[in-house]
Amino acid sequence: MKKFKIIPVIDILNSEVVHAVKGERDKYKPLKSVLVKSAEPVEIITKVKNVTLIHEVYIADLDAILKREPNYSLLAKILKIPDIKVLIDPGIILAKNISEYSDYGLNSLILGLETIENLSVISDCLETMGEHKTIVSIDMYKEVILTNVKEIKNQGPLETIKKIEELGVKTIILLDLYKVGQKIGGIPPLYLKVREQFNGQILVGGGIKDIRDIEMYKHHNFSGVLIGTALHDGTIELEKLRKININ
């Protein structure tokens, strides 16, 4: 059985780390963290790695997702941080965008349902990056799928995920933007249904409240969680986090 993952989140907007709340990107402010007095991505990632002993990071390049200039040079700097693994959602729209990231040495490339134009983008990524480096983010708002992909636009999460799995996807992220930054806590019944249905790895982002939440997801055989707000506001105790990450 694969190790349960706890992955810190870095949301980048205007080339600095921001505090994401409810997917309302026009209201995002620079991150204020108890861990580091900076909103500079390399500083924050380095500090988080050192204090949590977690060597993996999830990056959402919101500049790219919002169809602005992607943070290519910043990504290159982040990848020079010693012993760091990067999962990034850079707002992939078309298959041709995948090649822009295939040579970076990423741990995984994330395809968000919110941005991809069609399902063939997923198939192309599986071919280019391989199944172990391809992650599909099931982007939702209050459990309604966010997407422009015609085949799944009016479908529920369970039907959508079934289609995604049939393409050969082995890892998904359940990401409800409404829950982001709110520390709502608990496991939604929908997520438990997804866990029963989907045979691959499931990461969960948005709404993680505390260590107890993390332990619950681990107990229910999810593959990992993405943590942001509860880490940076001090709710998650570092000693307990390090302990659960080791076990």
Segments from the language model and where they lie:
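Hydrophobic faces of well-ordered beta-strands that scaffold small-molecule active sites
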Residues: 5-12, 57-59, 86-90, 109-111, ...
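Conserved anion-binding
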Residues: 8, 12-32, 102, 106-180
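N-terminal beta-alpha supersecondary unit
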Residues: 21-63
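Catalytic cores of alpha/beta
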Residues: 81, 86-108, 190-224
